[in-house]
Amino acid sequence: MKNLFAAAFAAFALMTGGAVADVVVSSKIDTEGGVLGNMILEVLEASDIPVVGKVQLGGTPIVREAITAGEIDIYPEYTGNAAFFFNEADSDVWKDPEAGYKRAAELDLQANNLVWLEPAPANNTWAIAVRKKIADANNLKTMSDLGKFIAGGGDIKLAGSSEFVNSPAALPAFQSTYGFKLSSEQLVILSGGDTAATIAAAARQTSGVNAAMVYGTDGGIEPSGLVVMEDDKNVQPVYRPAPIVRREVLEKYPAIVKVLEPVFARLDLETLQKLNGRVQVGGEAARDVARDFLKSEGLIK
């Protein structure tokens, strides 16, 4: 009878959630979401924090709704997305890496009791990548360098989406800030907004293309022999990935802060590009890539 009661109580606890203290770890459905979500899952698990994995749950609206509803407890989000969560997209604060992070943290804590932990240094925003041979030969590292190179007659032909080429916030903003202008002959507009296509065009030098519209941490950048030009004047909003966690959960498991901080601190642009590339290009499983990275950095055993 005692065993029957215990079993019934356990079943009730599972249904109500009253006795289940597992931290539900989730992420977005894209490649980087899979890598980052699995990093969080692996590190918490290695730290003896009980977890349940719901990695690559869906797009931004799905995971956002899930965490505000308490259906998941932690997932990696991008600082720049808070501009749209809170209808502040016109503010320049999102172009400053630190100020944008602080504003996101402040708004989400007040509105939703969500805590933003320290973000990675990597910035997954709109960018321009150039073939590495050209960048190395001309010492091109930043958008200021690229602007001077183009303005001085440097041979650049860029593949991009129609939105990137025409949106005032994208290529036109880069051109006005960095003092260059690409003619129609220097542009190849590809349908859709797929950076895989623009990267492939630059890698294969399709129609003479040697530069591409990218997102900063795209996994195909490095394997395709491209290098991202740093947006040194902060033209674009900054999208730094950071774990966000329900405050109630963080109060129960405060060690989450300490164990995740060194993980995200190691995720610079080049590191995330390589990790994403192992999944996108190399075909490895996101969890295997995450685990291998954490072990190689001494963050888990």
List each language-model region with its residue ranges.
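Sec/Tat signal peptide C-region and signal peptidase I cleavage site
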Residues: T16-A21
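Short helix-initiation/N-cap motifs at beta->coil->alpha
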Residues: T31, K54-E65, S162, S183-A200
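Extracytoplasmic "Venus flytrap"
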Residues: D22-I40, V55-G59, E163-N166
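Bacterial N-terminal signal peptides that target proteins for export
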Residues: M1-A8
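Contiguous mixed-secondary-structure segments that line small-molecule binding/active-site clefts
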Residues: T79-P172, S176, F180, S184, ...
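Short helices/loops that flank or line small-molecule/ion binding pockets
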Residues: E42-V43, P61-I72, E88, T177, ...
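Glycine/small-residue-rich interface belts in oligomeric ring/scaffold proteins
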Residues: V51-D90, W94
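Short, polar/charged alpha-helical segment
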Residues: T31-P50, P172, S176-Y178
